[in-house]
């Protein structure tokens, strides 16, 4: 059973999936940094210095804090600023994956469109062609 599992785990598809998951996690971290450290500050600067990560609605009267960390300590909050940031992360990742898949499909279509070369004739076919040509000359 252990041998069977090892064979399964070492198949190309499983290894490819593992590599894809690792690269996807790294890409997710890059996109999170892009959104949190580059895009959201620019949007905040355009909108007058607003920090979207601190946008929240207190769901109880005990929540009086002005920042999200303290508000969460005081009670339940609806942190819609964090949700906006995560949604933007998702949209960027989905768009990049869409572009990558679109490019891969375009490459596949161009490869499929190329006509396949005719296979080289076998020895029998060459011999029969020579016999035919000799018979034509007689």
UniProtKB/Swiss-Prot annotation:
How does the record classify its membrane topology?
A: Multi-pass membrane protein
Subcellular location per UniProt equals:
Cell inner membrane
- Which Gene Ontology terms cover its molecular function? mechanosensitive monoatomic ion channel activity
Q: Name one GO cellular component term.
A: plasma membrane
One Pfam family name is MscL
Which cysteines pair up through disulfides? They are none
Question: Which keywords does this Swiss-Prot/TrEMBL entry list?
Answer: Cell inner membrane, Cell membrane, Ion channel, Ion transport, Membrane, Transmembrane, Transmembrane helix, Transport
Q: Report whether Cell membrane shows up as a keyword of the record.
A: yes
Family matches, as InterPro entries: Mechanosensitive_channel_CS, MS_channel, MSC/AndL, MscL_channel
Sequence intervals crossing the membrane: 19-39, 40-60, 81-101
| Cited PROSITE patterns | MSCL (PS01327)
**Could you tell me which HAMAP family the record lists for this protein?**
MscL
Describe the family membership recorded for this protein in Swiss-Prot or TrEMBL.
Belongs to the MscL family.
Complex formation? Homopentamer.
As for what it does, the entry says:
Channel that opens in response to stretch forces in the membrane lipid bilayer. May participate in the regulation of osmotic pressure changes within the cell.
This protein is called Large-conductance mechanosensitive channel
Q: From which organism does this entry originate?
A: Afipia carboxidovorans (strain ATCC 49405 / DSM 1227 / KCTC 32145 / OM5) (Oligotropha carboxidovorans)
Traced from the root, the source organism's taxonomic lineage reads: Bacteria, Pseudomonadati, Pseudomonadota, Alphaproteobacteria, Hyphomicrobiales
